[in-house]
Design a protein with these regions (language model features):
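Short amphipathic alpha-helical interaction segments
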Residues: 201-215
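Residue-level detection of the helix-turn-helix DNA-binding "recognition helix"
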Residues: 108, 186, 212, 216
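C-terminal non-catalytic scaffold/interaction domains in large multidomain proteins
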Residues: 185, 227-228
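A short, conserved structural fragment
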Residues: 215-227
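Catalytic cores of DNA base-excision repair glycosylases
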Residues: 2-176, 188-195, 199-205
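Residues in the recognition helix of alpha-helical DNA-binding motifs
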Residues: 87, 209-213, 228-230
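Hydrophobic residues on short alpha-helical segments
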Residues: 178-185
Length: 230
């Protein structure tokens, strides 16, 4: 949930999500409709589909127990290197090296104040040397909190990163339209394309294209003239 979503928005949703799906078994058996209904408001809805797929794989391949190895975790749907390493560090207290936005900010602030276009490959050896091998979980917790403080006090040092990208405005974006269309489909057992267009009052061509995308990605299904959650 914390991938590209602020902590303040995640906390409430996390509590509801865990209450509804307390284990991998309940999550794997849940309908996509129920999962997406709780997920609404977090954005990046592909993560919700990935979580359901992950739960299914953990049940079928790993006897319901999440693997602790980052090398195995990275093979699960929607899990990249940084997320796999973060799970290994935070859930299993393993001394793995990874970079997230606050970790990056700390090391750029202290070691690259006079540089621009700093690559993560330059940061990784420094992080590896500094990492607390005995208690990596607490070390990363502290580092991430410290990164938040640095941003408040000194601005965003991550602008010096080679990988820095300013996030495009959400208002009026395709991301926003996808969320609105998906929310509309969630609100009724079945809904027609015409109803969606009338309700959202957006450009019909863009809505039709968005419906096709969501259908191709496994979010919704089309039966005759109506759409519903897959």
């Amino acid at each position: 949930m914390l991938q590209q979503t602020q902590v303040e928005r995640v906390i409430e949703k996390y509590q509801r999500f865990i209450s509804a799906f307390p284990d991998f078994s309940s999550l794997s058996q849940a309908s996509l409709h129920d999962i997406l209904s709780i997920w609404q408001g977090l954005g990046y809805n592909r993560r919700a589909i990935a979580l359901k797929q992950i739960a299914h794989e953990v049940i079928t391949k790993y006897d319901g127990i999440l693997p602790f190895s980052a090398d195995i975790l990275i093979q699960l749907p929607g899990i990249g290197k940084a997320t796999a390493s973060a799970i290994a560090a935070f859930a299993f207290n393993q001394p793995v090296v990874f970079i997230e936005t606050n970790v990056r900010r700390v090391f750029i602030h202290f070691f690259f104040q006079d540089r621009d276009n700093v690559k993560d490959s330059e940061l990784l050896p420094l992080i590896e040397r500094a990492l607390d091998q005995d208690n990596p979980r607490q070390w990363y917790y502290a580092l991430m909190d410290y990164g938040v403080m640095l941003k408040k006090e000194f601005g965003n040092a991550n602008r010096k990163s080679f990988h820095y990208q300013r996030q495009a405005p959400f208002q009026g974006s395709q991301r926003q339209l996808r969320g609105l269309v998906l929310k509309t489909v969630l609100q009724a057992p079945k809904v027609t394309e015409t109803t969606i267009i009338k309700k959202l009052k957006k450009e019909p061509k863009k809505i039709k294209e968005t419906l096709k995308q969501l259908q191709m990605e496994g979010f919704i299904r089309k039966e005759r003239n109506t759409y519903s959650i897959a």
